[in-house]
Amino acid sequence: MMSTRSRELSTPLRKFKCVVLGNVSVGKTSLITRFMYDTFDENYKTTIGIDFLSKTMYLESDTIRLMVWDTAGQERYRCLVPSYLRDSAAAIVAYDITRTETFQEASNWIDIVRKERGDDVIIMLVGNKTDRQDERQVSWEDGEQMSKESSSMFIEVSAKSGYNVNLLFKRLAQAMPGLQSTRLNRSISNLGWSNTDLDEMTEINLENAYELEFEKQCNCPC
């Protein structure tokens, strides 16, 4: 069996940008942190501006680097979102299953993505916080219906418990355009996955740069 190192040397590394969108406090940062580090912190601070992390993923026939952009959900930053979508291959639109308003806003986030990228982007609609079933306000069926209407993929997860988080990113990676794994392995069960490569992660805090860009380009009221 080919080692991870051998595969990395023999397979060209393709990079795909994924932007994570959604209202404030739907758990965007928690989703990313669970995927990257397999940890959860109840006391995360709200993202200001944008953060960037990347992770190398090994599929059966491909090696890719997924570059994940964690965006702020505050209204004052929305005018900058299109600029971060322009070269993206995928967008995760997250909502909180315990807050109906975040689900309603998810359709607006999807519209922003489609307006900027059309059909040249993979959209994954993600209902977060399934660990709080007793507080659920948005049904699984509602999420599935929105995904069908918007031609998006759909999954429910819990960043807190880790439920379905790896599966979310597996499905996203599988759907990336131009990969042998995409063409040959349409079922999730045939997708090879290595969760051992945590040394390929990079974290950059772009808060200051984002704030300067905001002040320079955005005319939104603050």
Task: Label each residue range with its predicted role.
Residues 68-69, 92-96, 125-128, 156:
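Conserved beta-strand segments of the P-loop GTPase G domain that flank and frequently precede/overlap
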Residues 22, 27-28, 72-74:
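Conserved phosphate-binding and hydrolysis motifs of nucleotide-dependent enzymes
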Residues 1-25, 63, 120-222:
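Conserved P-loop small GTPase signature centered on TRAFAC-class small GTPases
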Residues 29-41:
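A conserved segment at the C-terminal end of the G1
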Residues 76, 80, 102, 142, ...:
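Short acidic active-site motifs
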Residues 88-107, 117-120, 131-137:
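Conserved Switch II/interswitch segment of TRAFAC-class P-loop GTPases
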Residues 44-79, 86:
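Switch I (G2) and immediately adjacent beta-strands of P-loop GTPase domains
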Residues 23, 42, 97-99, 181:
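Short, conserved catalytic or interaction motifs in soluble domains
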